[in-house]
């Protein structure tokens, strides 16, 4: 049995927990929760019969195998360091934090030193396995075009001074580097960092806000010595958190299952 603790108790954490509780194989179980909003953690713990932790230190000190971060980019550094130092592997959902190269190298070296693992799920895009394999050759171009409903980008756009009520047709709201993209859209474009890490090449990112869109659309283009990789995924937004896709949560659940099962399919 893989014993799991969750950091962050929002919509994604709830999806992960329910999926593992309904798994007939029952090879992984969430045993403890922590959230900066203690009421959220307590509520989810009461619903599942798991432990409610009042601090991250309390969570990582428990008898757990794996910590899953599904909180925010600001929670990543502390979560990873404390998890690794307490002999636990960790899954990072808020992979946008790794756009900070210095932080990525710091955590990479700590995991290497302690003999532990940091896992980054594929998230809401397809083809990451092919991109990882292709990165062993020479990559010459990586781009991501993401189209989302306006309401899914609302908070990030309004923070930049844009009036979302004035967007009446598809509008390019960002075009630039992966580093600038994750800085301006920290809750919306984690997939750009996953793509950049997998390809070992900084992705060019375009974000389109579409008032008529009902899905989150991610188009990937990778060119290199292996040829050309093109993928397009149209994801249903997470029902309780339209900033992200349901597939992002499912990719974490699939990763947890892979870690708990004897056979793993895919790169």
Swiss-Prot record:
| Catalytic machinery residues | 218
Pfam families xref list:
Asp_DH_C, NAD_binding_3
The residues the record assigns to binding NAD(+) are 124, 190
According to UniProt, this protein's pathway is: Cofactor biosynthesis; NAD(+) biosynthesis; iminoaspartate from L-aspartate (dehydrogenase route): step 1/1
* InterPro entries in the record: Asp/hSer_DH_NAD-bd, Asp_DH, Asp_DH_arc, Asp_DH_prok, L-Asp_DH, NAD(P)-bd_dom_sf
A Gene Ontology molecular function term for this protein is: NAD binding
Keyword Membrane assigned to the entry: answer is no
One Gene Ontology term of the biological-process aspect is: NAD biosynthetic process
EC number in record = 1.4.1.21
Reactions accelerated catalytically? L-aspartate + NADP(+) + H2O = oxaloacetate + NH4(+) + NADPH + H(+); L-aspartate + NAD(+) + H2O = oxaloacetate + NH4(+) + NADH + H(+)
User: What's in the keyword line of the UniProt record?
Assistant: NAD, NADP, Oxidoreductase, Pyridine nucleotide biosynthesis
HAMAP family noted in UniProt: NadX
Describe the family membership recorded for this protein in Swiss-Prot or TrEMBL: Belongs to the L-aspartate dehydrogenase family.
- What is the recorded function of this protein according to its Swiss-Prot or TrEMBL entry? Specifically catalyzes the NAD or NADP-dependent dehydrogenation of L-aspartate to iminoaspartate.
One further remark on this entry is:
The iminoaspartate product is unstable in aqueous solution and can decompose to oxaloacetate and ammonia.
- Which protein is depicted? L-aspartate dehydrogenase
Organism of origin is Methanococcus maripaludis (strain DSM 14266 / JCM 13030 / NBRC 101832 / S2 / LL)
């Amino acid at each position: 049995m893989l014993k799991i603790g969750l950091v962050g108790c929002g919509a994604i954490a709830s999806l992960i927990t329910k999926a593992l509780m309904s798994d007939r194989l029952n090879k992984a179980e969430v045993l403890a929760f922590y959230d900066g909003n203690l009421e959220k953690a307590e509520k989810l713990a009461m619903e599942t019969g798991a432990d409610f932790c009042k601090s991250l230190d309390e969570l990582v000190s428990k008898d757990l195998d794996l910590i899953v971060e599904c909180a925010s980019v600001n929670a990543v550094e502390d979560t990873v360091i404390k998890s690794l130092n307490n002999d636990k592997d960790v899954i990072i959902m808020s992979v946008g934090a790794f756009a900070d190269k210095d932080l990525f190298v710091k955590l990479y070296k700590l995991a290497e030193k302690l003999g532990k693992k940091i896992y980054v799920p594929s998230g809401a895009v397809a083809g990451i396995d092919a991109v990882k394999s292709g990165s062993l050759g020479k990559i010459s171009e990586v781009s991501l075009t993401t189209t989302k409903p306006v309401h899914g980008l609302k908070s990030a756009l309004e923070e930049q001074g844009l009036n979302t009520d004035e967007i009446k047709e598809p509008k390019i709201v960002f075009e630039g580097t992966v580093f600038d993209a994750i800085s301006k859209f920290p809750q919306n474009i984690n997939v750009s960092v996953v793509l950049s890490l997998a390809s070992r090449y900084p992705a060019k990112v375009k974000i389109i806000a579409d008032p008529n869109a009902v899905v989150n659309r991610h188009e990937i283009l990778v060119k290199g010595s292996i040829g050309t990789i093109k993928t397009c995924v149209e994801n249903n937004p997470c029902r309780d958190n339209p900033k992200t896709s349901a597939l992002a949560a499912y990719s974490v659940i699939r990763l947890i299952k892979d870690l708990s099962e004897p056979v793993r399919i895919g790169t």
